[in-house]
Regions:
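Conserved beta-strand hairpin/beta-sheet module of binuclear metal-dependent hydrolase folds
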Residues: 1-36, 40, 148-163
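Active-site metal-binding loops of divalent metal-dependent hydrolases
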Residues: 13-16, 56, 91-92, 141-143, ...
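Cap/insert and terminal regions of metallo-dependent hydrolase folds
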Residues: 25-32, 36, 154-236
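Residue-level marker for buried hydrophobic side chains located in beta-strands
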Residues: 9-11, 52, 86, 158-160, ...
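Metal-dependent catalytic neighborhoods of phosphoester/phosphodiester hydrolases
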Residues: 62-74, 215-218
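Metallo-beta-lactamase
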Residues: 29-43, 47-59, 71-138, 187-201
Length: 236
């Protein structure tokens, strides 16, 4: 996201390539190199000013660091976005450092150690304004302290739902992911997000959906459904 005032903000950065062999049972396919994708948009990794990490599961922050082999020594992990402030909630950071049994396999310390060492980690404890037009709001359920960026343009507000609503099909309130650590909390938090999205005509971005990137949502009695598809190009 470009804010028009010099900020280039990246929301999550995917699985990366450091642990693909270790995670091969997920059967990843059609993976792309994020650096190449950014270059296609005339953005270098060094240009990114802020990285918002919705949470620290490997599939959302794996590209935060890159592995460099050291001759005769341990591998070195360097920041992929060396000039960027990295935004994480304090609740998620504490969960990352001291994970519960259900989430332990989703966290890799090497994804974040270089960021911590650099001093470019910013921990938020409450809903926070990053800059004009970008607000960071906290949601629990899938994991403690997940950040959902709310990106406001002249046309509408976009909600990067992360794993609060990972797929368009997940708009159905009772469809809770098996990966959610606290399913009842997930339901309540999803309803909170959907009520506002429907009433304010916000567009919800689905980060795990291969077919539907973004839609508005519509309330039907006590339930919700994905409604009109929305282009993401107007975000900037």
């Amino acid at each position: 996201v470009r804010d028009g005032n010099g900020k280039i903000v990246l929301v999550d950065n995917g699985t990366g390539n450091k642990h693909l062999k270790q995670l091969s049972y997920y059967n990843f396919f059609d993976l792309v190199d994020l650096k190449d994708e950014l270059q296609r948009r005339d953005v270098a990794c060094e240009d990114v000013t802020d990285v918002i990490l919705t949470h620290l599961h490997f599939d959302h922050c794996g590209y935060t660091t890159q592995k460099e082999e050291q001759t005769g020594g341990k591998p070195l992990f360097k920041m992929a976005f060396p000039n960027a402030i990295h935004w994480v909630s304090r609740a998620q950071w504490e969960n990352f450092l001291h994970p519960n049994a259900l989430e332990a396999d989703s966290y890799f310390i090497e994804n974040m150690q270089a960021v911590y060492d650099s001093g470019k980690l910013r921990l938020i404890e409450n809903d926070t304004n990053l800059c004009p037009g970008i607000d960071l709001r906290l949601f629990d359920g899938h994991t403690p302290g997940q950040i959902a960026p709310y990106i406001t343009t002249p046309e509408r507000t976009y909600v990067f739902a992360g794993d609060v609503i990972p797929l368009a099909a997940s708009v159905s309130p009772l469809w809770i992911s098996a990966y959610d650590t606290y399913p009842v909390v997930s339901y309540n938090e999803k309803m909170r997000m959907l009520e506002e999205a429907a009433s304010e005509k916000q567009a919800v971005i689905y980060c795990h959906d291969a077919y539907t990137q973004c839609t508005t949502v519509k309330k039907v009695n006590d339930f919700f459904k994905a409604d009109q598809k929305v282009s993401l190009f107007s975000i900037g």
